[in-house]
């Protein structure tokens, strides 16, 4: 019976430790995905600006 209490205690400590480790790993992955999304958004905004300028130049050249 004493062994069961020790086993449950050790299992609980391991579960808490591994749970915190997983949360950190998952948070890092989320931050990387968020950063990729931000870079994609910024790049698309720049491309739209360049395309709009090119359209303005083409319209000006046509007259």
From Swiss-Prot:
Span of the signal peptide: 1-22
Coiled-coil portions: none
Keywords: Amidation, Antibiotic, Antimicrobial, Immunity, Innate immunity, Secreted, Signal
GO biological process terms, semicolon-separated: antibacterial humoral response; defense response to Gram-negative bacterium; defense response to Gram-positive bacterium; defense response to insect; defense response to virus; innate immune response; response to Gram-negative bacterium
Record-level GO cellular component terms: extracellular region; extracellular space
Summary of the function given for this chain in its UniProt record: Cecropins have lytic and antibacterial activity against several Gram-positive and Gram-negative bacteria.
Designated name of the protein: Cecropin-B
Arginine amide PTM sites in chain numbering: 62
InterPro entries membership: Cecropin (IPR000875), Cecropin_insect (IPR020400)
Similarity section: Belongs to the cecropin family.
PANTHER family documented for this protein: CECROPIN-A1-RELATED
Cysteine disulfide partners in this protein: none
Provenance organism: Drosophila sechellia
Encoding gene per record: CecB
Cell compartments where the protein resides: Secreted
């Amino acid at each position: 019976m004493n062994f069961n209490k020790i086993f449950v205690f050790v299992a609980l400590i391991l579960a808490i430790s591994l749970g915190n480790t997983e949360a950190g790993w998952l948070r890092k992955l989320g931050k990387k995905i968020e950063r990729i999304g931000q870079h994609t958004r910024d790049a698309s905004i720049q491309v739209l600006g360049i395309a709009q300028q090119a359209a303005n130049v083409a319209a000006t050249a046509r007259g």
